[in-house]
Design a protein with these regions (language model features):
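Active-site rim helix/loop that mediates acceptor-substrate recognition in acyltransferases
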Residues: 2-29
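Glycine-rich acetyl-CoA-binding "A-motif" of GNAT/NAT acetyltransferases
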Residues: 29-36, 93, 106
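Conserved beta-strand in the GNAT
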Residues: 32-41, 48-53
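Conserved acetyl-CoA binding element of GNAT-fold acetyltransferases
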Residues: 45-56, 85, 110-113
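Conserved acetyl-CoA-binding loop-helix of GNAT-fold acetyltransferases
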Residues: 51-56, 60-73, 96-100
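Conserved GNAT acetyl-CoA-binding A-motif
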Residues: 68, 75-87
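Conserved beta-strand-loop-alpha-helix junction that forms the acyl-donor binding cleft
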Residues: 85-94, 113-117
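Conserved acetyl-CoA-binding loop of GNAT-fold acetyltransferases
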Residues: 99-108
Length: 124
């Protein structure tokens, strides 16, 4: 998944949700168990989907699609007209999911990042 100890900590996610209070969603079962979530936001110009997850036992039931659609509507309501995201190239299921939803791969781009603090990967 690409998680790390700083921005994916409870404090990091809380800070993110405070900055983006209307564009991220969770889905709960009737028993109150979270089985899906999406973290998304925008910079005033472009929307970004940062994390999307559905528990393995609840996949292929439309939960991910419903979460994405809710986020896209929320971003559109805030005047955002284009949304971007990053998917690991080796994530075949994830890439197929986003392609089915109309997200196209971009050629000619190289994704780069730089940690400003020491981080530890906590990939699941």
């Amino acid at each position: 998944m690409g998680l790390n100890t700083i921005d994916d900590s409870r404090q990091g996610i809380t800070r993110y949700l405070e900055r983006n209070p209307t564009t991220s969603f969770v889905r709960e079962t009737s028993d109150g168990i979270i089985d899906g979530a999406i973290l998304a936001g925008h910079d005033g110009r472009r929307g970004y989907v940062y994390h999307t997850a559905v528990s393995p036992e609840h996949q292929h039931q439309g939960i991910g699609t419903a979460l994405v659609n809710a986020t896209l509507h929320a971003l559109a309501d805030e005047g955002i007209i284009k949304v971007a995201l990053v998917v690991f190239s080796r994530n075949d299921a994830g890439n197929a999911f986003w392609q089915r939803l109309g997200f196209s791969a971009r050629d000619g781009l190289t994704y780069r990042d730089k940690a400003l603090y020491a981080i530890t990967r906590i990939d699941t």
